[in-house]
Amino acid sequence: MVDFKVVLSDPKTGLSYKIDAAGAAAGALLGKKIGTEVDGAPFGMSGYKITITGGSDKTGTPARPDLPGNGRRGLLISDGFGFNATHNGERRRKSQRGNEIAADFVQVNAKITVYGEKPVTEIFAAAAE
């Protein structure tokens, strides 16, 4: 099975937490697209809803929300994900991934959209001990 590093952001506090997702937790993310809301129970966060906001593969190639599929493509881009133009009108061909989470992703970025009963700090404080 695959393993993911999930970077979970808390919009209320501005803090982020790292979750090592393996097994059922990783399976809950496979095939999902950026912007999809996922249940937090596989990550030990019952009652929470998590929205996938992005990710990157083993080479560091970022996932682009507006690119369908899960493969890597070379796109001619002028600005946005994975490229910042230094000159006016500059365009460059850069590798980008599709918006579907695949097995060769290493990191998945997400944020909390619906909060459960137990505070986030308690959930991750117990995991740190």
Swiss-Prot record:
Source organism superkingdom: Archaea
TM region positions: none
GO biological process: translation
Record key words, sorted: Ribonucleoprotein, Ribosomal protein
InterPro entries, sorted: Ribosomal_eS6, Ribosomal_eS6_arc
Keyword match Ribosomal protein: yes
Keyword Ribosomal protein: yes
Gene Ontology molecular function, alphabetical: structural constituent of ribosome
Coiled coil feature spans: none
GO CC terms: ribonucleoprotein complex; ribosome
Listed Pfam families: Ribosomal_S6e
Family matches, as HAMAP family: Ribosomal_eS6
Protein family according to the UniProt entry: Belongs to the eukaryotic ribosomal protein eS6 family.
Designated name of the protein: Small ribosomal subunit protein eS6
Gene: rps6e
